[in-house]
Amino acid sequence: MARKKKQDKGQGPKTIAQNRRARHDYHIEDTYEAGLVLTGTEVKSLRAGRASLVDGFAQIKNGEVWLHNVHIPEYTMGTWTNHAPRRPRKLLLHREEIAKLDAKTREAGRTLVPLSLYFRNGRAKVEIALARGKREYDKRHDIAEREAKREMERALRRRR
């Protein structure tokens, strides 16, 4: 009898939510992939593609990393077992990574922000970044660079 093939849960990561605002408001210094400790209704809500990372941030307390202000709406088919949409969620990282992040976030002006939320091999993951806040003139400078690049590309297209 032939063996059954193991069902593939998807080739690459299935992105649920991205925090575009973080890349605009912060200088991203380093990124880390962390697992999430979730309840059943949170996973079902994420599988439906519903989440918002806009106001999210991560904090280190007692050697554990916690994700705050990430909105995962209640599962529509859930009953009294539904979760609180903005509850703090524990992130799973290696001890060495937590120690390194703790040392770096103690420096002035550094924070941990979520960049994206996705499923990898059936497990919910969040990409967090060690970031430093941008000032208003930094944001304007980035916008000016982007506009100059667009103008250059337009000019090249017209020449062809």
UniProtKB/Swiss-Prot annotation:
The keyword RNA-binding applies. Gene3D superfamilies: 2.40.280.10. GO terms for molecular function: RNA binding. Keywords: Cytoplasm, RNA-binding. GO terms for cellular component: cytosol. PROSITE patterns: SSRP. It is found in: Cytoplasm. Residues 1-23 are annotated as: Disordered. It holds the Pfam family SmpB. GO terms for biological process: trans-translation. HAMAP family: SmpB. Required for rescue of stalled ribosomes mediated by trans-translation. Binds to transfer-messenger RNA (tmRNA), required for stable association of tmRNA with ribosomes. tmRNA and SmpB together mimic tRNA shape, replacing the anticodon stem-loop with SmpB. tmRNA is encoded by the ssrA gene; the 2 termini fold to resemble tRNA(Ala) and it encodes a 'tag peptide', a short internal open reading frame. During trans-translation Ala-aminoacylated tmRNA acts like a tRNA, entering the A-site of stalled ribosomes, displacing the stalled mRNA. NCBIfam families: PRK05422.1, smpB. Belongs to the SmpB family. This is SsrA-binding protein. It comes from Thermobifida fusca (strain YX). The gene is smpB.
